[in-house]
Each structure stands twice: as structure tokens, then as C-alpha cells.
Amino acid sequence: MSNPELLSEEKAILVETLKNKLQALAEQHVDVLESLAPVVRKRVDVLIEIQSQHDELEAKFLEEKAALEANYQKLYGPLYSKRSEIVSGVLEVEGETEEREEKGVPDFWLKAMKNNEILAEEIHESDEEALKYLKDIKWCRIDDPKGFKFEFFFDTNPFFKNQVLTKTYHMIDEDDEPILEKAIGTEIEWHPGNCLTQEVLTKESSESTKPITKTEEYESFFNFFSPPQVPEDDAKIDENTAEELQNQMERDYDIASTLRDKIIPHVVSWFTGEAVQDEDYGASWVDDEEDDDDEYSDEEA
């Protein structure tokens, strides 16, 4: 298996490729401002200036927000550590006197992730036994290059040798908006015969003594650690390929955002199912509001 870091260095950055493709498409359209009447153009110029002032304030807000989040992330640290110790059985809670063989909270992270709709789609039945060995998931911000990093901690297991699997997201600022530049995942060192992402099939050939081998790719949660790769030749990336790669990266980033913003900070609620009920309630509340709006519209009509 190739080293993801080497691949990312040798290949063009996907975000640049997509930007070039989109730029080419944008040039085909008429400039909206040039098509406006002079008096309307003056008004729009003022609106653009207002928007510019707004964007400056928003940039300051995002900067202060990032600093505040970083500060509270440090405060959360001891709580996450204690949570991890209880889940893994390193720390027993006060008041427990009965000796039991079962330590900690079995299948804690697996059950929590399966209760989330986005992550449940990524977890296949063949993944579950391996994910039972998952002890903890942590994330942290990185500054050089800018982005964030996940660490998945596993007990010793029969599937792979790694004790820690990592996934790092490198971000760039584009018009004050963070955009994914690339993602780098750990190369998983699978134990022979236990790889969950692919299998090498061997078939005897009747025409020669050399057997024919074929690699069968499997859907698996552990593909999360093998981000989408960019073709070596940018010229071969047509519009459809660029769109497909963009969709893959967006899906990958959705998974990362779910882990970072929902699962890690509120994993207990996802384990118990409380978070699922909260999300369902929120969706119902939005649907009810939309129904009310439709009723008002019907009455007005």
C-alpha cells in the first residue's frame, strides 16, 4: 500500500484543480455587474461596500471564536481523559464493590457512532468486531499547516497492529472561509487475512503457470483513513471527475465534522440515544414550522 503522505506531495492539490475547473466554467458566464444599468450599478457598488464591512466584522468574529474554542478545548481535556478512563475500565467509579470480569463500558464508541445517521452509513457489519476495540477518539487543532487532527485509540486486536489511527485535515483560507486542501490518513497495518477494506483474490490460470491475482475493494468504515486521491495527470480530470472527487471530499468532511462537533463532545448522549431523540425533535420542529407556513400561505391565497 502506498504512503498517503508521499502521494499527497507528488500529486497536484485537489482544491487547486477544482478551482481551475470552476474558473473555466465561470468564464463562460456573463459578468452580472457589467450587464446592470449605470444607476443600478451604483447602488450595487454601495451594497458591495456594505458587504465588505460585514465580511471584515465576520473575519474578526471567526478569529475570536477560534481563540475561545481553543481555550475551552483545554478545559474539556481533563473531562475527556476521565471519560476515557472509565470507558476503558482503567478507572472504576466510586461505590463499586462487586468484582466483575467485564471492565469499563463495552462497545461504547461503536454504539455511539451507530446511533448517528451519517456515521451509521459508514459502519458495515464486517467493521463492528474491529470497532469494539476502539477505546477513545480525540481531536485537536493544528497550526502549521492549519487544520485539525483525529486520533483513534485501539486496544490490541486481531485486525491490525496500529494502536493509534490518525486522520489529519489541512485547511486553507479562501475569502475568509476555510477550505479543505487535503486529508492524510494512517496506513493501516493489517494482520494477514484480516484486512477489512480489500482482499487479494488468486485464480489459477489455464494458459500459464502464473496465477492471476485481483484486488477486491470492500466498503468499510476504515476507508475513512484512505482519503480520495487525485489522478497524477491533472489534464485527465474532466468536469465529471472533478465533481465526483468534490463529492467524495465533501462526504469525507461531513464525517469528520460529525465526529468533531457532535460525537466527541457529546458521545455519552449518542451512546444512550438521547442525542438521537434531540435531533429527531429538532427535525420535527422544523417540519412543523414549515407546515404552519404552508397553512398561512393557503389562507392568504
Swiss-Prot record:
One of its GO terms (biological process) is double-strand break repair via homologous recombination. Keywords: Chaperone, Coiled coil, Cytoplasm, Nucleus. GO terms for molecular function: chromatin binding; histone binding. Gene3D superfamilies: 1.20.5.1500, Nucleosome assembly protein. It is found in: Nucleus; Cytoplasm. The keyword Chaperone applies. SUPFAM superfamilies: NAP-like (SSF143113). One of its GO terms (cellular component) is cytoplasm. It comes from the Eukaryota. Pfam families: NAP. Residues 15-69 form a coiled coil. Residues 278-301 are annotated as: Disordered. A motif (Nuclear export signal) lies at residues 36-51. The acidic domain is probably involved in the interaction with histones. May modulate chromatin structure by regulation of nucleosome assembly/disassembly. PANTHER family: TESTIS-SPECIFIC Y-ENCODED PROTEIN. Belongs to the nucleosome assembly protein (NAP) family. This is Nucleosome assembly protein 1;3.
